[in-house]
Amino acid sequence: MLRVIARLNTGGPALHVSYLSKGLESRGYHTTLVAGRLARGEDSMSFVAEELGVEVIALRELHREISPVYDPVAVARIVKEIRRVRPHILHTHTAKAGAVGRAAALLAGDAAPPVVVHTYHGHVLRGYFDPLTTQIFKETERALARHTTRLIAVGPEVRDDLVEIGIAPAEQFSVIRLGIDLDARVLNDASVREQQRRLFGVPDDRFVVGWIGRMTAIKRVPDVLASFKRLLELGVDATLCLVGDGPDRDDAERQAKELGIARHVLSVGYQREVSPYYALFDALVLPSANEGTPVVAIEALAAQRPVVATRVGGVPDVVTEGEDGFLVEVGDIDGLANALATLARDPELRRRMGEHGRERVIPRYRVERLVDDVDELYRELLSEKGLPLPPSS
């Protein structure tokens, strides 16, 4: 089979395709993984695939941005790869790879894969672009969906949103949640917390709010800072730790100074190993304008850290209101601050929410469950086409 992703940048899709490609080996699938190049300033997560022994074919012409120069070349390169591999299944991940990969399948002639699958790891059809661009993208997705055997959404909210805006009927979708090796990505060790607190000079009894991500407009980092300022005004002794880089980092650090909170803020930049930071945090804040399935929320809950987030995209499928975190509307600065204050003032509530979160996400987001679900779907689609099945494990 041929799997295509726009790029292996930091985030859930890169983890997903790496773990999935490796896991399906034991089920009799041979995967060729094609990945495009990172955008300027993005951090790579290709090391996950490398550590798993997954071979990646680099397609430098495949960029996240629309390019009248490079996009036709990327399509032609994928057509060539389809003709070389002759896959039974083409599976694309993320918007750009979905467009380029499925276009290539249409142009591959007699080598065209009989089964075409696309996974939406969220979508860019709300909150990312101006109305005209968004409408063009919607029409493109609708056209591509008519040539796709099955569409996958990483959560029911993502599926429902895509159905609502008319991308495809509900029966064309399957919901298959992410699978993550949480044991490898999250440390639940009190000694790590102590080490991190000593490293950054944070007293053990101080409430630490954490944020992890790429600093772009969709993540609404200004809301993180504004809600943290409000939290301090509520009388909470707190530190904010920002983990991540991106085009908005300088603006965020400037805003922290303008708000008068810079001495309470740790901005540590991109970190390849994030598990020690979950140990440092008491809670995670995630005020994004849009999310697919937020890996940072899953990892925080696995580390027994409650999450305060916005009620967007696939977030409600990860964070259960009042049980392992709190959900607010986008832009609700007071709501974010009040939820964080509630957690800061009640260590027992934090403990209960953290335990509930870990108990829920560990089984739900296992890699083995992901591989089982995708294997079952592939076998169903191959059977419908009358194609041979891989040997059962």
Please provide the spans of the model-predicted regions.
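N-terminal strand-loop element at the rim of the active site
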Residues: 3-11, 15-70, 247
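A conserved mid-protein helix/loop that constitutes part of the nucleotide-sugar donor-binding site
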Residues: 14-22, 207, 211-236, 247-254, ...
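Nucleotide-sugar donor phosphate/pyrophosphate-binding loop at the beta->alpha transition
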Residues: 69-76, 111-117, 124-147, 160, ...
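A short, active-site helix/loop in glycosyltransferases that binds the activated sugar's phosphate group
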Residues: 146-173, 180-184
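A short, well-ordered alpha-helix in the C-terminal region of glycosyltransferases
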Residues: 195, 335, 342, 349-364, ...
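Aromatic "clamp/platform" in nucleotide-sugar-dependent glycosyltransferases that forms part
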Residues: 270, 289
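Short hydrophobic beta-strand element within catalytic cores of glycosyltransferases
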Residues: 306-309, 319
